[in-house]
Amino acid sequence: MSRNGNFIDKTFSVVANILLQIIPTTSGEKEAFTYYRDGMSAQSEGNYAEALQNYYEAMRLEIDPYDRSYILYNIGLIHTSNGEHTKALEYYFRALERNPFLPQAFNNMAVICHYRGEQAIRQGDSEIAEAWFDQAAEYWKQALTLTPGNYIEAHNWLKITGRFE
């Protein structure tokens, strides 16, 4: 699996370098993309601190809202991996403000809300749990609206819990 992952990472890097050379872009855009590419590489290797540094530099240089949305989304992924769910939600939300067509951000927000609902149940607070589950349902519905047929487990959960309309 890691060999295949490394092959994909190397392929991405080669393609990215070719694109940087042939697509007309400003030097700032090229520099931003270079930081983004380096951030993705570090993230795929589990070097989250290095990835964040690269993403923050890319954010400083990148002006296109669509491109910024993917940088913000990846920052959210890192915070999710680190268990920093509040920060992750903030970054996913900021990504969606710039690009409302990121079903993966809606899905990840739903997963975090669902997890928090399960935590609330374990703590004996069913009212708080229901609020988290309702929020998870809203995010999953948005993800499913954007990509019908994806997120099958979420779709089934929505049906089973009576949250699917």
Swiss-Prot record:
Record-annotated disulphide pairs: none
Keywords: Chloroplast, Membrane, Photosynthesis, Plastid, Repeat, Thylakoid, TPR repeat
TPR repeats: 32-65, 69-102, 117-150
Lipid bilayer topology: Peripheral membrane protein
Cellular-component GO terms for this entry: chloroplast thylakoid membrane
A biological process term (GO) from this entry: photosystem I assembly
Reported function: Essential for the assembly of the photosystem I (PSI) complex. May act as a chaperone-like factor to guide the assembly of the PSI subunits.
Family named by the database record: Belongs to the Ycf3 family.
Protein name per the record: Photosystem I assembly protein Ycf3
